């Protein structure tokens, strides 16, 4: 936030993959925890879960945790949790994990594919993991509508509240 206020750009040379053959080699990547402005996922997401799922799920859980804290809803009673749910999605989801496990399958065979392959890439895992972490027992919804996923998630959550399916809905998207 301080950098936004100071008009400081987060754009830099891509580090997460070899971009040599690409026309564009800059991006606004989320910096690791050891960076001056880095993101420390361990504040909100257990290390075991981080190892099992793609980064979009980790970002989604972290964002949801921050949203619940900011709204004062991170310690709801059981009765409140019965009518609280999630509507969180992703436009593409776990492509990095799908790519890496496809290479494992092709080069090393099926016995070497991670047992977390499927459940670590599914778009509904953000809502699922958030519901598990916070004990949310209301609607659990995952949207996949490309670039409009976050907006659709918010709209669907609003409709669920309007239709009295829930009192509280956590909504958004992660990529």
Task: Locate the predicted segments by residue.
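Conserved "HGTGT" condensation-loop signature of ketosynthase/thiolase-family condensing enzymes
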Residues: 1-92, 97-138, 159-162
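Acyl-CoA/ACP chain-elongation machinery
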Residues: 15, 167-175
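Short, flexible active-site-adjacent loop segments at beta-strand->alpha-helix junctions, enriched
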Residues: 90-92, 147, 175
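Short loop-beta-helix segment that forms the pyridoxal 5′-phosphate
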Residues: 139-145
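Short conserved active-site loop signatures built around small residues
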Residues: 150
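Active-site histidine-anchored catalytic micro-motif
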Residues: 153
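Internal active-site segments that recognize and position negatively charged phosphoryl groups
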Residues: 156
């Amino acid at each position: 936030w301080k950098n936004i206020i100071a008009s400081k750009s987060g754009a830099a040379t891509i580090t997460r993959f070899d971009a040599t053959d690409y026309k564009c080699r800059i991006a606004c990547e989320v910096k690791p925890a050891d960076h001056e402005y880095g993101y420390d996922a361990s504040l909100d997401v257990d290390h075991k879960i981080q190892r099992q799922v793609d980064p979009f799920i980790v970002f989604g859980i972290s964002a949801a945790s921050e949203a619940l804290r900011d709204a004062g809803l991170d310690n709801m009673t059981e009765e409140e949790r019965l009518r609280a749910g999630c509507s969180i999605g992703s436009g593409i989801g776990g492509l990095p994990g799908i790519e890496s496990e496809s290479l494992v399958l092709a080069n090393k065979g099926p016995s070497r594919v991670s047992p977390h392959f499927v459940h670590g890439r599914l778009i509904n895992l953000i809502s699922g993991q958030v519901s598990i972490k916070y004990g949310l027992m209301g609607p659990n919804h995952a949207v996949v509508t490309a670039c409009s996923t976050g907006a659709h998630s918010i709209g669907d959550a609003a409709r669920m509240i309007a239709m009295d399916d829930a009192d509280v809905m956590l909504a958004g998207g992660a990529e």
